[in-house]
Structure formats: C-alpha cells, structure tokens
A protein has these predicted regions:
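Single conserved hydrophobic/aromatic residue that forms the stacking wall/gate
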Residues: 1-11
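Conserved class I S-adenosyl-L-methionine
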Residues: 36-47
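Conserved SAM-binding loop of SAM-dependent methyltransferases across substrates and taxa
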Residues: 48-61
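Conserved SAM-binding motif I beta-strand of class I
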Residues: 62-67
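Conserved SAM-binding loop
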Residues: 76-77
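Conserved SAM-binding strand-loop segment of SAM-dependent methyltransferases
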Residues: 85-95
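A short acidic, Gly/Pro-enriched loop at the edge of an enzyme's catalytic core
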Residues: 101-109
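Short glycine-dipeptide loop
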Residues: 132-138
Length: 179
C-alpha cells in the first residue's frame, strides 16, 4: 500500500508527480525487479517528496530526499516524522551538486525531476548515470522526450516511456560500459 493512499502528502505550493504517472512508474519498477530491500534511492529534486516516500513505502533500504528550498525541507522532515519513514533521510542542498558528489555506482534508483525551466538537464542526467549501479534505474521527468540515441550516448537504455500532459516520463536503465 502506497504512502500516498495511507495519508495525503501535505506540502504547500508544490504539486507532486501526477498520481497516474507515479503509479505507473512504480508498477514498471516492481514488474522489472520486485525486491526493493536494500535499494539505495536518491530523489535529487525532491519537492513534495512523493516519489521518494513512495519508494520507501515499497521497502527501499535507504531513500535520500534532496531539496534546496528550506521551507520544503522542513515540510519533508515533518512528513518523514508523520509517516514514521525511518528509511528516509532529508538533506538540504542543490540536487545537481549532490548527484555530482554521490558515490559512483552506489544508487539503485535515481529520481530526477528538476524544474522544467532549467538549462542543465544533460548535466543532471550524466551525474545521475554516474551515481547509478550497473543495472540501476533512472526515472527522468522532463519537458520533452529523449530519443534512444541521446539516452545511449549517456550510458543508459530506455525501458519505458509515458507522456501525461506536459510531462515526459522516462524510465531508463544504466548499462555496463563497453570494453
């Protein structure tokens, strides 16, 4: 049972990933690899934290929510306490910088949903790819679709894609580097 269904996320001034998109994403991940235990999840631009809290509710071993806005960080911390989400760690900081410093190859899932108006999607995807273990997953929410050639150039392969309104939702998997 998802945390969203257990309790409404209550974050002022932010809209989480649409319910239908979030449900589809987690169905994709569960069908690909149903065992979440031990997963290290990074939600680099947490916002409401809906995606990260959902990963925790599915049994992820450790979920790190990174958010720059101090007010949102306080609200995320309050949600963590209210939901008794022990696997969740809330950090205040820049998601792009945090991903750049993340241990290489240590994340099983990176949730990447930066504001649509930023010019550095490519940098964020590259930093997320570096953080991922081989076979790890990158969920990318973007204002446009990325084609398979762009994705492959970043060391990733497309797994699933969904368009819902203005949201282009990509589930990508890190592939082993070519010798």
């Amino acid at each position: 049972l998802s945390i969203r269904r257990q309790r409404q996320m209550c974050i002022r001034d932010r809209r989480p990933t649409p319910d239908r998109v979030r449900e589809t994403l987690f169905n994709w991940l569960t069908s690909a690899d149903g065992d979440w235990s031990g997963w290290q999840v990074v939600d680099a631009f947490a916002g409401t934290g809906a995606l990260g809290f959902e990963a925790a509710s599915r049994g992820a071993g450790r979920v790190t929510l990174i958010e720059q806005d101090a007010g949102l960080v306080a609200q995320l911390s309050a949600s963590k306490a209210r939901l008794d989400a022990d696997a969740v760690n809330v950090l205040r900081g820049d998601g792009l910088v945090a991903l750049g410093r993340w241990g290489a190859g240590t994340a099983n899932l990176v949730l990447l949903d930066p504001p649509f108006d930023v010019p550095w999607y490519g940098q964020a995807i590259a930093a997320a790819q570096k953080a991922l273990a081989v076979g790890g997953w990158l969920y990318l929410e973007a204002p446009r679709a990325y084609d398979a050639e762009e994705i492959a150039a970043l060391g990733l392969q497309p797994y699933r894609y969904l368009k819902a309104g203005a949201v282009h939702a990509h589930l990508l998997q890190r592939i082993a580097p070519q010798p």
